[in-house]
Regions:
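N-terminal pre-domain/capping segments
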Residues: 1-109, 174, 269-276
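Hydrophobic faces of well-ordered beta-strands that scaffold small-molecule active sites
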Residues: 7-13, 36-38, 64-69, 116-118, ...
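Active-site acidic/histidine proton-transfer and metal-coordination neighborhood
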Residues: 20-23, 75-178
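Alpha-helix N-cap and loop-to-helix initiation/capping positions
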Residues: 45-48, 52, 84-99, 127-138, ...
């Protein structure tokens, strides 16, 4: 494996569920990675807690590689519930989500970020459907708002096949819009082979999330997230494919399950190092 991959590792801040910037710094230091993808929503919602983050990170030699924002009202109870409530699809939460997104764009610019990622929600596939036009309009508004500030956006992957996402990205046709590729999500959502999906979406690749999963045995149900290196993602093929593609972006370790996330991310770092 290309040794530069280890130098481009980062940690997703929300995986660590930090109470404040000092807690985040302490956990990053215990993991042994000083690069982070930062969740923007806590900073926007609790500025009195997070307003010293830039200064503290500078003192601690921690680099923010990118940002992430979420959307209100998401229900991950079942595959069907997240299809209805995920991302910017629901009309009931759109106005408030749009206000929050605009504020997050300002915040991202203040943090000198060049990339922000998000879950758009399940994308419609029929171009003549009203839902397609609605989603196209909303995504273009979001993309252009960040683009006006010199910021790229990355779709989180997994909620549709790579071919469907490629078609939507082609239709959107925005140079600052691409993909934050997560191989485990392709497994969790049962949307095809992660490596083939990576090849399909390669031209739009902005960043990768690194986590692992086991595919469901019951179609329509979730797969199961597991510690990186213990699931079904073929990591040697994954990193080999990135090397073939000459990918130079960041690789952010994410852990969204379990009660030992700091330890699990440390294991992930060690596993990735063992592949070199």
């Amino acid at each position: 494996m290309d040794s530069s991959f280890a130098q481009r590792l980062a940690v997703c801040s929300w995986s660590l569920q930090p109470s404040d910037p000092a807690d985040l710094v302490q956990q990053l230091q215990s993991i042994g990675i000083n690069r982070v993808q930062i969740a923007l929503d806590p900073i926007r919602e609790h500025p009195q807690v997070w307003n010293k983050i830039v200064e503290l990170f500078r003192q601690s030699n921690i680099t923010i590689v990118s940002g992430m924002f979420g959307t209100l009202g998401e229900d991950y109870t079942t595959m069907e519930s997240i299809r209805r409530t995920g991302g910017v699809v629901p009309d009931a939460t759109w106005d408030l989500n749009w206000r929050n997104i605009q504020t997050n764009a300002v915040l991202a610019r203040q943090l000198d970020l060049t990339l922000v990622t998000f879950h758009a929600g399940f994308l419609p596939h029929e171009e003549d459907a009203l839902e397609f036009k609605k989603m196209l309009d909303r995504i273009l508004r979001i993309t252009d708002r960040f683009g006006d500030k010199g910021i790229h956006l990355g779709f989180e992957t997994g909620q549709e096949t790579a071919e469907d996402l490629r078609a939507f990205l082609t239709r959107l046709n925005r140079p600052n819009l691409g993909v934050n590729f997560d191989p485990a999500n392709m497994v969790l959502y049962d949307k095809g082979d992660p490596i083939e999906a990576l090849r399909t979406l390669g031209p739009w690749l902005k960043q990768c999330h690194l986590k692992d999963a086991i595919r469901t045995q019951k179609p329509g149900n979730w797969g199961r997230e597991v510690v990186l290196g213990t699931g079904e993602v073929d990591w040697r093929r994954f990193f080999g494919t990135l090397a073939e593609m000459k990918f130079t972006g960041d690789l952010c370790i994410e852990r969204e399950a379990g009660t030992r996330r700091t330890a699990d991310i440390r294991v992930a770092r060690q596993f990735i190092a063992s592949l070199t």
